[in-house]
């Protein structure tokens, strides 16, 4: 990478970070705790969000921002059908959301009626790690069906997360996934990161995840 290109990239990221700070200030001002959910395609981002809504609906008011590369509203429609407000962001092919996109989405949500905002980033294990959004927590969903080597192959995204969901654990008897090997990789990159083994299909582990979230929202109020 040339010196000129490095300077341009740094300028873009710096501008993004400044706007991310404004997003955080806006969310803080509204008393909204926010999550940036990242994962590869098919890991279960939307399923996790729907399970979270189901578990926390009696206690928390939840809003969702859905990010997709194509002009579709499939996931946002599911959230709305579950009774929660949602905004769809179509990136036009970009492999990640950025602070500008979230800044444009926030005015479309009733922030004064939301306790927890969940942002579903574009399915990708590289690009989303580089662009801060201004959310309070970064959460990664890793599906056991993806294999146990992902922390070793995509270290950047694992280093920057605040919580890790290991999804689809109901498939462990049927796939080659060494949990100890996977956890060693995670621990090497992000020592002590809180981890939630979960199955969105069976509901196993959802209660623990939802309780952690509820406590985080309460502590921010």
Task: Please report, for each region that a protein language model flagged, where it lies by residue.
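Nucleotide-state-sensitive switch-loop elements of NTP-binding domains
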Residues: 3-25, 29-38, 43, 47, ...
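Residues at alpha-helix caps and immediate loop-helix transition turns in enzyme cores, especially N-
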Residues: 48, 98, 150-153, 178, ...
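Canonical P-loop GTPase G-domain recognition
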Residues: 171-220
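Conserved C-terminal guanine-recognition region of P-loop GTPase G domains, centered on the G4
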Residues: 128-135, 144-192
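Active-site glycine-centered loops adjacent to acidic/histidine catalytic or metal-binding residues
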Residues: 68, 167, 199
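Residues at the C-termini of beta-strands that transition into short coil/loop
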Residues: 90, 142, 199
């Amino acid at each position: 990478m040339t010196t000129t290109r490095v300077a341009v990239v740094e300028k873009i990221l710096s501008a993004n970070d400044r706007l991310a700070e404004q997003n955080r200030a806006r969310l803080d001002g509204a008393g909204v705790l926010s999550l940036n959910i990242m994962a590869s395609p098919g890991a279960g981002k939307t399923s996790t969000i729907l399970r979270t809504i189901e578990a926390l609906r009696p206690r928390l008011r939840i809003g969702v921002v859905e990010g997709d590369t194509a002009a579709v509203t499939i996931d946002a429609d599911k959230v709305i059908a579950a009774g929660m407000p949602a905004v769809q962001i179509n990136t036009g092919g970009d492999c990640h959301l950025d602070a500008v996109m979230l800044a444009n989405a926030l005015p479309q949500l009733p922030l004064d009626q939301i306790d927890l905002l969940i942002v579903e980033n574009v399915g990708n294990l590289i690009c989303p790690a580089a662009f801060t959004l201004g959310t309070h927590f970064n959460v990664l969903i890793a599906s056991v069906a993806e294999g146990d080597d992902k922390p070793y192959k995509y270290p950047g995204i694992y280093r920057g997360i605040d919580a890790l969901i290991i999804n689809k654990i109901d498939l462990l008897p049927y796939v080659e996934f060494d949990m100890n090997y996977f956890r060693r990789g995670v621990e090497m990159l992000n020592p002590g990161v809180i981890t939630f083994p979960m199955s969105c299909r069976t509901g196993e582990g959802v209660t623990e995840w939802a309780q952690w979230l509820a406590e985080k929202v309460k502590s921010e109020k």
